Amino acid sequence: MATSSIRSRALGLSRRARFETTRLPFIGRRYKSDETLNRISSKITQPKSQGASQAMLYATGLTEEDMSKAQVGISSVWFEGNPCNMHLNDLSGIVRDSVLRAGLVPMRFNSVGVSDGISMGTAGMRYSLQSRELIADGIETVMNAQWYDANISLPGCDKNMPGVLMAMGRTNRPSIMVYGGSIKPGCSAKGQKLDLVSAFQSYGQFITGQIDETERFDIIRNACPGKGACGGMYTANTLATAIETMGMTVPGSSSCPADDPKKLVECENIGEVVKNMLREEIKPRDVMTRQAFENAMIVVNVLGGSTNAVLHLIAIADSVGIKLTIDDFQAVSDKTPFLADLKPSGKYLMNDLYSIGGTPALLKYLLKEGLIDGSGITVTGKTMKENVASWPDFPADQDIIQPLSNPIKPSGHLQILRGSLAPGGSVGKITGKEGLRFEGTAKCYDYEDAFIESLERGEIKKGEKTVVIIRYEGPKGGPGMPEMLKPSAAIMGAGLGQDVALLTDGRFSGGSHGFLIGHIVPEAMEGGPIALARDGDRIVIDAEEKVVDLDVPTEELDARRKQWKAPPLRYQKGTLKKYCALVSDASHGCVTDGPI
């Protein structure tokens, strides 16, 4: 079958010819499969009343025997304009052939995507979080309208992962994710290991005179050497690892680099995996249980993962009918040590973790230490514990994952803070390297670029304790809750990490580090206290007490509230206008179909 499929492609034969490479026994005017795997697609391929449906399918190249086979929707978030996604069409072709070899009918389709790295710091970033909903809605639409029996999704960039998982949760048909993989590290002319965050931080270094133009250009020219998602424990790798932990990928998918031959092997073998899922009726809601989400939250904290995991795991849980809250994250963070010396706060990249065994070795270690539960079923049909049992242990001399006896921080870095500035909650990314308490005077900016301009003018001084507030960047105010990587990277690049805390109703990239508090609820557009803060106000952030307070008398805040007026929405037409009308707040995952 494999040889026949390769020969068919080489000769440039039609899709119909490729489908004809394997035939089932002919019985009368029907072809019969030895298994009934087409439980969904049979609704259109079998009834005489659906003859027009069948005529259309014959036109796509299906044969008579194909009408009795299960149909697998292969959804790729491929587009050329992003290294995270540019190779996914090639991978989906390998997946298609694998599905064909398994005796199933592959049906490829595509979804939209946004490059967070390219759109970062621009109005384009307002479309990023909203693309998660478009991906989920698009895959759900095609899977249901086309009556596909199973789904294989190939995501690459940040919002791709939660988008495809939300669609899987909604449709609840046998589904599996194949992660596109991480990019290799870049290298500067001086031999310095680089990644995308190096490029973002180079601007702060440049405007403060730490590097010249030649050095700046060397960094941006060499930071991203090819295909794959951003290489640190940023949002894409955080989500991919969490999803593998939940059991929705084959072992090793999240840590295997984009250009590693094993990524091709993963795609070549995926057809039999999904066939077994169809046979055993393993569905997303069987895999993504509350315990699976508990495991995912633990692993995110162990790895020092992105704050976006809070938003996205809440939304994925919502899609399978599980109510996950920001308080669940705090409960996990309180009992989970931070162990991984990975960027952005550490020095290693995902490729380095892969070199010592990757995600399966990490899960095996955490199982041995009793931090996670390995009893849940996964897409392989086995439990997590069974999946990793034969996987090699971490080498004894590795220093990427610290032992439990010597954690980087004894509790998690994700902190849920409430207080007079964020009564509905906020999410802090506090590794401990920047301290656990910050007190300073507010400098308020109503949009991201206003802060960058202020930094360029030298208005943020080293030695002064400043709390930068960037507001009207929430789900409705942004809209789309854009990420503040450009400001946070500029702060760190300018050497102001110990002098500045950054608060926002927007989000932070997984590449951000420093004293950062985002996801502030209520957002400024809704009249939350963040909208009432003024330059010179005293702000107190205490990670141990889990508070973020605006130290202004109640009477003064009441007076300011009476004077406050909501600004007009930035978009009065189009997809972002619709998004503003539907989106929930950050504490409820920014879902658009109503939180459970």
UniProtKB/Swiss-Prot annotation:
User: Which chemical reaction does it catalyze?
Assistant: (2R)-2,3-dihydroxy-3-methylbutanoate = 3-methyl-2-oxobutanoate + H2O; (2R,3R)-2,3-dihydroxy-3-methylpentanoate = (S)-3-methyl-2-oxopentanoate + H2O
> What are this entry's molecular-function GO terms?
2 iron, 2 sulfur cluster binding; dihydroxy-acid dehydratase activity; metal ion binding
Assigned EC number: 4.2.1.9
InterPro entries attached to this UniProt entry: DHAD_IlvD/Edd, Dihydro-acid_dehy_C, DihydroxyA_deHydtase, DiOHA_6PGluconate_deHydtase_CS, ILV_EDD_C, ILV_EDD_N, IlvD/EDD_N
Q: Where does Mg(2+) bind?
A: 116, 158, 483
Recount the known activity regulation.
Answer: DHAD activity is not inhibited by the dihydroxyacid dehydratase inhibitor aspterric acid (AA).
Targeting signal (transit peptide) range? 1-18
State the source organism's domain of life: Eukaryota
Q: Where is the active site?
A: 509 (proton acceptor)
Q: Gene3D superfamilies, from UniProt?
A: IlvD/EDD C-terminal domain-like
Sorted alphabetically, the keyword list is: 2Fe-2S, Amino-acid biosynthesis, Branched-chain amino acid biosynthesis, Iron, Iron-sulfur, Lyase, Magnesium, Metal-binding, Mitochondrion, Transit peptide
Q: Which GO terms describe its biological process?
A: isoleucine biosynthetic process; L-valine biosynthetic process
How the cofactor binds, per note?
Answer: Binds 1 [2Fe-2S] cluster per subunit.
Q: What class of enzyme is it?
A: lyase
Q: Which family does it belong to?
A: Belongs to the IlvD/Edd family.
What NCBIfam families is this protein classified in?
ilvD, PRK00911.1
What is this protein identified as? Answer: Dihydroxy-acid dehydratase pbrD, mitochondrial
- Organism, scientific name: Penicillium brasilianum
Protein's gene: pbrD
